[in-house]
């Protein structure tokens, strides 16, 4: 097992795969959840990120939380046609990376991230360069621990990995 890191735990999701949508629904039923409005990110990204951070810091005092921009296919199509596919994806990734950085500054040390590009943006924003690979949480998805200070317990996945309770299982594995 990996060394414990302490600190709060959060799930950040930018994936809109079928598996991730089921995971978002399962996590939302058990824990506080904040849906990031993509249109709001385009109108005032800094304000939107600030609102998410205020909400999350308060909620994370009592429980893990979920912050997501995941949406069903028809909503994703609408967002992409309105803002452009690449631009919409980039804005979501930048926002989630900024949220991760803000949460890390507030003491969060356990991050579960859904979405390949989102995961890359978060790991980069947190300055993670080297990882210790820990036990498997789900096929193809291990728990990891960053080197350096502060240390982060991390799990990230591309969209269709894991069962419906993956987020809760991953948070438990990262304790």
Question: Residues of each region from the PLM?
Answer:
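Active-site catalytic microenvironments in core metabolic enzymes, especially phosphate/sugar-handling
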Residues: 1-175
């Amino acid at each position: 097992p990996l060394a414990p890191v302490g600190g709060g735990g959060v799930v950040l999701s930018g994936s809109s795969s079928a598996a991730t949508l089921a995971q978002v629904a399962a996590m939302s039923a058990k824990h506080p959840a904040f849906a990031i409005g993509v249109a709001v990110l385009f109108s005032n990204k800094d304000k939107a990120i600030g609102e998410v951070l205020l909400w999350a810091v308060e909620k994370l005092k009592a429980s893990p939380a979920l912050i997501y921009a995941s949406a069903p296919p028809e909503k994703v199509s609408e967002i992409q046609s309105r803002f452009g596919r690449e631009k919409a994806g980039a804005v979501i990734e930048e926002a989630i990376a900024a949220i991760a950085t803000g949460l890390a500054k507030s003491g969060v040390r356990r991050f579960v991230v859904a979405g390949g590009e989102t995961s890359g943006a978060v790991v980069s924003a947190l300055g993670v360069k080297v990882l210790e690979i820990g036990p498997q949480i789900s096929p193809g998805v291990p728990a990891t621990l960053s080197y350096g200070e502060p240390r982060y317990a991390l799990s990230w996945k591309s969209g269709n990995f894991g069962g419906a309770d993956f987020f809760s299982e991953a948070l438990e594995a990262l304790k």
